[in-house]
Amino acid sequence: MTDPTSVVERRVVATSGGGTVTVFELGSGPILGVLHGTAGLDGPTAAMEDLAADHRVIAPCLPGFGSTPDEPSLRSIHDWVVALSEISDAAGITGAPWLASSISAMLALELAAIRPEAFASLVAVGPTGLWDADDPGTDLYAVSLGEQASLLAQNTSTLGVLAGDPDGLDGDELIEVGVSRYIRRRTAASLVWPLPDHGLAGRLHRVSVPVTLVWGADDRLVPPSYGERFAGLLPEATLAAPIAGAAHLAELDAPAEVAAIVRLRAPAGA
């Protein structure tokens, strides 16, 4: 018998705004929405595969982050929040618990501030969106590409196309990978550079669902100290202990630990 967690469905869905989004699905059980971090999404991650043992994991790839094409019309944080709302509906994750990372966690919080029913609960891994000039973290775009990868994940092999080994690729494949990396970096930069502050601090009080904040202990992009800042602004927040050995994208460095937190906050039997 085929293990249901090993069967990955990839589909392309149309949003109400006229765009299309690639969605990965695996596992069986209650729906869990998963939003990727800065590296983008090329297929199921280890955390997704873990959670698929008792959830129907549904993970859309946001525009410009891999298998979903770049969308030039997304020029402001408002554009992105509207797009995420449409993507959520099209992917079938509206109202379900979510796991979101980095910039996607920021967008999820922005969405919840104006659409409370967007998700039932959120596990937010290293969310961007706040800024403290006295505790700024490392500027991802002020370091080399190699340093960028190590800032995102201790285990850079988990970053997929963004930092994969190009050996063995032919000329056309090298071009394709290079273009994809450029678009991902440009898209991510548009959301967090030069500053990640789009006024989220003034809207977090509107987030009415439970939020669990998760940080990698070695996150130098959004330092773990920001967890207290987020927790102090959210009406219903739980701050988990920082995960040792994990950088910014803790769900990639510590998939089992993050999956365990998700199960605690969104149990499959609930």
Where would I find each of the regions flagged by the language model?
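Short alpha-helix in the alpha/beta-hydrolase fold that links the catalytic acid
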Residues: 47, 200, 209, 223-232
